[in-house]
């Protein structure tokens, strides 16, 4: 889920930050509108309409978490596009796509890697919450949330059934 989220956020943020102007305004206002919707509420509503499964969970989480990545990548792109090597590439007549791929993305990549790594935790928390509520991954597949849900009835006799998945989720 974070791979798709990172790809969507990187494309939107890079295009918005590099080209600027009315396109940047339009894209970032759309991102602001999407960020104003509570993600967990939307996660529950969309998941109620779709069949619970791994593919749908990946799709839902990736479509709900790309906005923060796009804002971060846009901010870094605004910084990187003013560096000398990017200005020289633009002055030499390179195509904007080539400048983005060869100069902007490598400059933004460390930030993308750190942000994607930190966002994995929120994706795990979203998935385990859905599975705990019974809306996530179904029985044959293992999920920490479904393990916690199943361990509720045995909490007095076998507390370790809930302890280990709970610790791993935290």
Residues covered by each model-derived region:
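Alpha-helical transmembrane segments of integral membrane proteins
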Residues: 1-170
């Amino acid at each position: 889920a974070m791979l798709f989220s990172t790809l969507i956020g990187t494309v939107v943020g890079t295009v918005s930050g590099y080209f600027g102007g009315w396109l940047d305004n339009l894209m970032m206002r759309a991102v602001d509108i999407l960020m104003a919707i509570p993600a967990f509420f939307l996660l529950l509503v969309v998941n109620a309409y779709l069949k619970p499964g791994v593919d749908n969970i990946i799709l839902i989480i990736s479509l709900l978490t790309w906005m923060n990545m796009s804002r971060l990548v846009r901010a870094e792109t605004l910084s990187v596009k003013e560096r000398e090597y990017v200005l020289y590439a633009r002055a030499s007549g390179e195509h904007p796509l080539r400048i983005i791929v060869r100069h902007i993305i490598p400059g933004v990549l460390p930030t993308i890697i750190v942000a994607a790594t930190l966002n994995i935790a929120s994706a795990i928390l979203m998935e385990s919450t859905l599975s705990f509520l019974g809306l996530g991954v179904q029985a044959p597949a293992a999920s920490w949330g479904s393990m916690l849900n199943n361990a509720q009835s045995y909490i007095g006799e076998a507390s370790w059934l809930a302890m280990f998945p709970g610790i791993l989720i935290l």
